[in-house]
């Protein structure tokens, strides 16, 4: 076979870059962590003079030191990876996407996803091609983008309210039943995270067939669990609109309906607030 042997990846235990939620090069990590930086100006496809071997070794060692420092600085990500691996019966070497897919869909590799036409929920919404030749999410005369709609009126304001919508994108995904029969599994992840935030240990103990119970006695580990569930929630709705094919992307979802639903709601809310 000319293809890769999948299990060969598990010759390693994990990949720091993969489990880190911050995706950047080792050099940038080193700078941010205040580590010593060392370059080696020799060509790697040519023999190195013996009098420079020690310098080459120092260069390689420097990368190891920075990798260890990155691991220590991303311990919360690592704890989350271990928890997701345990919940799914997979390994810490599996990617976050693989772990979350297993947590939601189990062994089903072709789940039947549900696409919702949001023009039925928000009359007047259009996925429309404009003069630039590209399609845009248009609603009430505005391009609301692909999610994350922002509106502001310049000025100085006092005595203002700061309001937040909890878990807007995950809630949209659940309300649209995007994952079909597996939507409940995703909803359970959200409910478990909320229960942890509210200290509702009794509710958590009955979820995921009791797999979470071992984490409930230690507040520090409970915090790691909450972070693991947050990663599962956030990585999921990103995959629904990814540019590449994956188990969570519906082929019709070119307009990013999970984030779009929230943007359409906020644009509707804008008009209602301005009426007051």
Specify the residue positions occupied by each region the protein language model found.
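Conserved catalytic alpha/beta cores of large enzymes that bind or transform nucleotide phosphates
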Residues: 186-234
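Short coil/loop linkers at secondary-structure junctions
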Residues: 34-36, 91, 179
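Common nucleic-acid-contacting/processivity interface regions adjacent to the catalytic cores
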Residues: 50-54, 58-176, 223-264, 268
């Amino acid at each position: 076979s000319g293809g890769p042997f999948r299990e060969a990846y598990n010759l390693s235990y994990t990949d720091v870059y993969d489990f880190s939620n911050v995706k950047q090069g080792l050099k940038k990590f080193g700078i941010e962590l205040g580590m010593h930086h060392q370059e080696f100006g020799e060509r790697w496809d040519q023999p190195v003079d013996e009098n420079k071997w020690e310098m080459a070794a120092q260069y390689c060692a420097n990368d190891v030191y920075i990798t260890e420092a990155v691991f220590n600085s991303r311990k919360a990500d690592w704890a989350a990876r271990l928890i997701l691996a345990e919940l799914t019966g997979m390994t810490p070497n599996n990617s976050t996407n693989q772990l979350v897919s297993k947590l939601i869909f189990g062994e089903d590799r072709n789940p039947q996803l549900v696409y919702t036409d949001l023009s039925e929920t928000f009359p007047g919404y259009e996925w429309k091609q404009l003069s630039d030749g590209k399609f845009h999410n248009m609603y009430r005369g505005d391009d609301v983008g692909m999610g994350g709609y922002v509106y502001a009126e310049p000025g100085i304001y006092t005595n203002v309210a700061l309001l937040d919508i909890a878990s807007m994108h995950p809630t949209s995904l659940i309300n649209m039943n995007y994952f079909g029969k597996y939507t409940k599994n995703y909803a359970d992840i959200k409910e478990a995270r909320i229960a942890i935030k509210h200290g509702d240990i009794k509710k958590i103990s009955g979820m995921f067939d009791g797999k979470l119970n071992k984490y409930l006695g230690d507040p520090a580990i409970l915090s790691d669990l909450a972070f693991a569930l947050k990663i599962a929630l956030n990585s999921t709705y990103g995959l629904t609109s990814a540019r590449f094919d994956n188990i969570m992307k519906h082929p019709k979802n070119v307009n990013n309906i999970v984030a779009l639903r929230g943007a359409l709601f906020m644009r509707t809310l804008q008009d209602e607030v301005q009426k007051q």
